């Protein structure tokens, strides 16, 4: 009988442990001695302070050897596509303006609409091709300079812009090359200055203090 009772108790305890009711747990007295870090209690299952698990910045899973920031090659697709779309939009607006100006003495009719539409299409394609070509040259020079120097900084931006202007205006002789290079140098220098304006202002403020 006693053996049967003991067997029954073991069976009951095994079932209770299986459903999580009979296992040993942590009481309030056991958890009362666990120190707090801020407002988060330390887990009894971890030997690591949760403060070290908090990341101040977003972290992404990257392939081995990959950079956290996009390089020139990745940005080239966005740059070329954005310039083409911007050129098409600007050219379409300019074509609409020119079309309305050239046909202002004509009555609203099908020939006038066709002429305006042709002007919009022609100007849109022209500006999209122009800005897209400039973006392609700029991106290609940027990738080549980055791979050659092994670094990505504002010097690459200025050099790529200068070389783009020089190559784009190379058909105009030495004067055209100089003018294109100066234009590219000026635009990219202003862009680099705009990107680093906050950093420069903070550095000047620290020096003044």
Swiss-Prot record:
An example Gene Ontology molecular-function term: protein transmembrane transporter activity
Keyword Transport: yes
GO cellular component: mitochondrial inner membrane; mitochondrial intermembrane space; mitochondrion; TIM23 mitochondrial import inner membrane translocase complex
PANTHER family: MITOCHONDRIAL IMPORT INNER MEMBRANE TRANSLOCASE SUBUNIT TIM23, TIM23
Record's keyword terms, sorted: Membrane, Mitochondrion, Mitochondrion inner membrane, Protein transport, Translocation, Transmembrane, Transmembrane helix, Transport
Transmembrane segment boundaries: 73-93, 125-145, 181-197
InterPro entries in UniProt: Tim23, Tim23-like
The protein's assembly and partners: Component of the TIM23 complex at least composed of TIMM23, TIMM17 (TIMM17A or TIMM17B) and TIMM50; within this complex, directly interacts with TIMM50. The complex interacts with the TIMM44 component of the PAM complex and with DNAJC15. Upon mitochondrial depolarization, interacts with PINK1; the interaction is required for PINK1 accumulation at the outer mitochondrial membrane, kinase activation by autophosphorylation and PRKN recruitement to mitochondria.
Protein name: Mitochondrial import inner membrane translocase subunit Tim23
First-listed, main subcellular location of the protein, grouped into a coarse class: mitochondrion
Origin: domain of life: Eukaryota
Pfam family for this entry, one: Tim17
Role according to the record: Essential component of the TIM23 complex, a complex that mediates the translocation of transit peptide-containing proteins across the mitochondrial inner membrane. Has a role in the activation of stress-induced mitophagy by protecting PINK1 from OMA1-mediated degradation and facilitating its accumulation at the outer mitochondrial membrane in response to depolarization.
NCBIfam families for the chain: 3a0801s02tim23
Family: Belongs to the Tim17/Tim22/Tim23 family.
GO biological process terms held by the UniProt record: intracellular protein transport; protein import into mitochondrial matrix; protein targeting to mitochondrion; type 2 mitophagy
Gene from which this protein is expressed: TIMM23
